[in-house]
């Protein structure tokens, strides 16, 4: 599907980023079905991204990256997701974390430079990935607030961490996790803290618990910390609740929503190709693309995608041009429309293709499962609707 220029890559840099993503997507697509079935991480595509510098896009230019903007990753991640959604999701989380930390300036320069330089220099294997590890069995979504059950106790010249983190996306291939914990220092009240924890830290282990409907290859297993010791310097500053960082988090979430847009685009491509090639005997050699009901469904697919991509990309471009806290509702709307329209596209594609879309070997069946994960990224629909209502009525 082709889009008018504002909704696709416009600058030479944007085109280059999309081409890097497509190079990895092409490799990853050949292995996506196997990794989905076996719940293994798509290392083949990740190796391409490590080699071509995609993993360091959001690192500042002064540290060897490209200072990529939200729009760059929206365009790149949607292209990457057409090959393998699980790979794209983990890479999107990595890039978004680096981007929002860079833009909001919430870490110390020493912390950020240490991570950034390793990210841009790791050009082989699985590269150097980072992700936020915040979810817990009893806590629910971290975006809803609450103090973690995971603890970090100040002891001597370091911290001792104990707890469990669920939804640890990319766990098998991460170099670091930013672990949220309740920090205990002496008799003082515990406070919410974040810790930059190397995944090689003794006392840290991964329980292979990830067995889900969709996004099966993300390796989002349970991380167990049992007397895991880190240096005193591992604590990274956490922004205050409701601070200036929040709009940056919302803005960079668009680069994650773009993954689900890309999955929907892959579902659309499969359905359109099927319609053009399917020639039942009853049609005397004509393809089903000539049937009015099929053409109606094809039109619905593209209408939904134009809506989703148009709002997502235009909102990202608006943010990059003039970041503002006043855009919170627009950012939420772009995410919600992208994730819900993506689900609608996958469902419409299955209706167009018919019963064969249910085959476990069909990429469309995988797209249908993967795309549903978009509902569970913040802001979830109910939080977005509450925001819209507050702005309209209060």
Q: What is the predicted role of each segment?
A:
Residues 164-205:
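A short core secondary-structure module
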Residues 166-171, 252-255, 374-377:
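Glycine-rich phosphate/pyrophosphate-binding beta-alpha loops
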Residues 43, 47-50, 57-164, 169:
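Glycine-rich flavin
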Residues 355-394:
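Glycine-rich phosphate/cofactor-binding loops in nucleotide/flavin-utilizing enzymes
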Residues 19-22, 262, 292, 299, ...:
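Generic structural signal for well-ordered, non-transmembrane alpha-helical segments
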Residues 8, 12-15, 255, 285, ...:
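Register-specific recognition of a single heptad position within extended alpha-helical repeats
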Residues 33-36, 306-337, 350-358:
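C-terminal helix-coil-helix/basic helical segment that borders enzyme active sites and/or dimer interfaces
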Residues 211-304:
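Glycine-rich beta->alpha junctions and the first turn(s) of the following alpha-helix
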């Amino acid at each position: 599907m082709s889009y008018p220029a504002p909704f696709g890559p416009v600058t030479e840099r944007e085109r280059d980023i999309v081409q890097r993503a497509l190079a990895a997507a092409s490799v990853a697509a050949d292995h996506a079905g196997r990794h989905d079935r076996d719940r293994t991480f798509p290392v083949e595509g990740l190796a391409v991204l490590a080699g071509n510098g995609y993993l360091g896009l959001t690192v500042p230019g002064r540290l060897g990256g490209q200072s990529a903007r939200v729009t760059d990753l929206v365009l790149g991640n949607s292209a990457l997701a057409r090959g393998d959604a699980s790979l794209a999701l983990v890479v999107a989380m990595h890039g978004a974390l680096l981007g929002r930390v860079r833009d909001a300036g919430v870490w110390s320069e020493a912390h950020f430079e240490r991570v950034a330089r390793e990210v841009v220099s790791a050009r082989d294997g699985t590269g150097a990935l980072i992700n936020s590890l915040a979810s817990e069995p009893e806590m629910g979504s971290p975006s809803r607030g609450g103090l973690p059950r995971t603890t970090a106790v100040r002891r001597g010249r370091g911290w001792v961490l104990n707890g469990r983190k669920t939804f640890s996306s990319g766990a098998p291939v991460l170099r670091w996790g930013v672990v949220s914990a309740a920090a205990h220092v002496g008799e003082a009240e515990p406070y919410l803290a974040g810790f930059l924890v190397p995944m090689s830290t003794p006392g840290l282990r991964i329980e292979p618990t990830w067995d889900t409907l969709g996004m099966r290859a993300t390796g989002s297993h349970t991380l167990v910390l049992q007397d895991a010791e880190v240096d005193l310097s591992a604590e990274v500053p956490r922004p205050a609740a409701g601070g200036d960082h929040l709009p940056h988090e919302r803005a960079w979430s668009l680069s994650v929503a773009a993954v689900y847009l890309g999955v929907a685009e892959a579902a659309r491509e499969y359905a359109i190709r099927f319609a053009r090639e399917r020639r039942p005997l009853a049609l005397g050699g004509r393809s089903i693309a000539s049937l009015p009901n099929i053409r109606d469904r094809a039109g619905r697919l593209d209408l939904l995608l134009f809506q989703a991509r148009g709002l997502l990309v235009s909102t990202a471009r608006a943010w990059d041009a003039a970041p503002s806290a006043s855009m919170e509702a627009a950012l939420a709307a772009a995410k919600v429309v992208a994730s819900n329209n993506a689900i609608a596209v996958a469902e419409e594609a299955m209706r167009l293709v018919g019963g064969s879309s249910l085959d476990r070997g069909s990429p469309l069946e995988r797209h249908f499962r993967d795309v549903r994960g978009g509902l569970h990224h913040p802001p979830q629909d109910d939080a977005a609707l509450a925001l819209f209502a507050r702005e309209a009525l209060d």
